[in-house]
Amino acid sequence: KDCDRLIAKYHDPDPFAMTRIVLAPCSPFSVTKESLAETAVFAREKKVFMHTHLAETNDEDDFCRQKLGMSPLEYMESVGWTGPDVWYAHGIWFTPEEIKRLGDMNCGVAHCPCSNLRLGSGICHVPALLEAGVRVGIAVDGSASNDSSNLLKEMQTALLVHRVGTGVSSMPPRKVIRMATRGGADILGQPEIGQIQPGMAADLALFRLDRIDFAGAMADPAHAVLFCGSAPRAEYTIVAGRVLVEKGELTGLDEREVFHRANDLAAGLLRRAGK
């Protein structure tokens, strides 16, 4: 009932809309099989997308096979959680055959390289996913498993980690940039975002490259922003024509106040936990 209420009140499917509802249990193993199946039917009735974390750890894969007699992806298939309106976070432990099926079913994968490395979960087979036609975007996971939530850092990490064992040509900078922009837009079903051209949403992230970090790297700025520097903050961020970051600072809020408030909350949490 609450999902129905939220969709009715907030979901806006129109192009350039800023608020959309997605039905997203944290993981398929945090809810019942019946609930997953009902969610899939309900989501399609309401024409909203679905998202969950899947195939993140080897333990998850083992648990699913032992308890249910099938892999996590097979479980998703059994409850209707596949298709162009579904995307999964992580997707590390898909088999080669499952990667092919993901492409055939037109599912999406949100790649979270820093979180995967931080937790030691594994490395997603992104080159294989892309070759199979799977839609791949780049994401940060969440604050519980990613301390910075810096998308540029995710891009830099993806650029480097997927060259191991596959060669430098398998993950060029522009492929990473495409995943982080048009790749995410494709997964979300929003063709009006993700690229700069007439008629598209005015979404821009601008970085200063006139710093010592980028000295000598101006032959290709796209290469420079990913290979050089330490994931710099955007100088300007514009979303739907609205400036949200100006001269490297968030607009509309006091960053120092947020900083101190967050530290106070963290200290209080540790006190209550007896740390």
Predicted regions located by residue number:
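Metal-coordinating catalytic core of metallo-dependent amide/deamination hydrolases
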Residues: 1-91, 97
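A conserved active-site cap/scaffold subdomain adjacent to cofactor or substrate pockets
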Residues: 96-97, 103-140
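Conserved, mostly hydrophobic/aromatic
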Residues: 23, 53, 76, 88, ...
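Glycine-enriched alpha-helix->loop->beta-strand junction motifs that scaffold or abut catalytic
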Residues: 40-49, 81-84, 101-110, 131-136, ...
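Alpha-helical segments flanking ligand/cofactor-binding loops in enzyme cores
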Residues: 37, 41, 74, 99-100, ...
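His/Asp/Glu-enriched, well-ordered alpha-helical/loop segment
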Residues: 78-85, 127-211
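Active-site microenvironment of metallo-dependent hydrolases
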Residues: 180-275
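Histidine/acidic-residue-rich catalytic or RNA/ligand-binding cores of hydrolases
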Residues: 58-70, 98-103, 120-129, 146-161, ...
